[in-house]
């Protein structure tokens, strides 16, 4: 079964309480799932002979600060036998705890830790839910859209104290805004390589 629309309908029919939507974008099937039922969905995708999504590719999140459930937790899987990828999306709030997939796929360990570290998404049942990319005492989650661009503190090595020190961020100049729109030429200016483009 390689037809994505047919595969999406098959999965929706098998898991009607867990899968609310199936859509195809850019040649990839996307399922909208209930976050609380993610383990059930992924177990089906792994074990069902029509699916065989046996390889987790990534776990990440997308931040929509204007929504009540501000995060979309996103999982990507690959079925080598079908030569097909699938994307699972589930909404979560800052306090929603999403079940971990580590019992089904031990390889998602660092993916889930990264999503926790950078977005603050908490995965229940994960044996080692701690930061993986930022420093131990790091304040906040840097990929959230409300995190300041310059961060909260500056980390540097102090030669006098012979250790790493944390200081408030000092900006020596204001952020600059580069406006490339020419009032005379508009935005249709030639870019390098445009001469190779066929008309």
Swiss-Prot record:
Catalytic activity: a quinone + NADH + 5 H(+)(in) = a quinol + NAD(+) + 4 H(+)(out)
Domain of life according to the entry: Bacteria
Signal peptide location: none
Catalytic activity, EC: 7.1.1.-
Gene Ontology CC terms, in alphabetical order: plasma membrane
Keywords: Cell inner membrane, Cell membrane, Membrane, NAD, Quinone, Translocase, Transport, Ubiquinone
Compartments, as annotated in UniProt: Cell inner membrane
Membrane spanning residue stretches: none
A Pfam family: Complex1_30kDa
GO molecular function: NADH dehydrogenase (ubiquinone) activity; NADH:ubiquinone reductase (non-electrogenic) activity; quinone binding
Major site of localization recorded for this protein: membrane
Bilayer disposition of the protein: Peripheral membrane protein
Assembly information from the UniProt record: NDH-1 is composed of 14 different subunits. Subunits NuoB, C, D, E, F, and G constitute the peripheral sector of the complex.
Protein family (similarity comment): Belongs to the complex I 30 kDa subunit family.
Function, in words: NDH-1 shuttles electrons from NADH, via FMN and iron-sulfur (Fe-S) centers, to quinones in the respiratory chain. The immediate electron acceptor for the enzyme in this species is believed to be ubiquinone. Couples the redox reaction to proton translocation (for every two electrons transferred, four hydrogen ions are translocated across the cytoplasmic membrane), and thus conserves the redox energy in a proton gradient.
Protein name as catalogued: NADH-quinone oxidoreductase subunit C
Taxonomic lineage: Bacteria, Pseudomonadati, Pseudomonadota, Alphaproteobacteria, Hyphomicrobiales
């Amino acid at each position: 079964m390689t037809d994505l629309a047919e595969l999406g309908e098959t999965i929706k029919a098998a898991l009607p309480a867990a899968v609310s939507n199936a859509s195809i974008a850019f040649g990839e099937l996307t399922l909208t799932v209930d976050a609380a039922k993610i383990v059930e969905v992924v177990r089906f995708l792994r074990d069902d002979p029509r699916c065989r999504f046996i390889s987790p590719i990534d776990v990440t999140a997308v931040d929509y600060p204007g929504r009540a459930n501000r995060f979309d937790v996103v999982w990507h899987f690959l079925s080598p036998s079908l030569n097909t990828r699938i994307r699972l999306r589930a909404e979560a709030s800052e306090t929603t705890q999403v079940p971990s997939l580590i019992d089904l796929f031990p390889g998602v360990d660092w993916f889930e830790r990264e999503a926790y570290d950078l977005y603050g998404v908490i995965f229940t049942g994960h044996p080692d839910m701690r930061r993986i990319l930022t420093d131990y005492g790091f304040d906040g989650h840097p990929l959230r859209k409300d995190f300041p661009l310059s961060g909260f503190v500056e980390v540097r090595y102090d030669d006098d104290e012979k250790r790493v020190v944390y200081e408030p961020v000092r900006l020596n100049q204001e952020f600059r805004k580069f406006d490339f729109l020419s009032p005379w030429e508009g935005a249709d200016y030639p870019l390098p390589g445009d001469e190779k483009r066929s008309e």
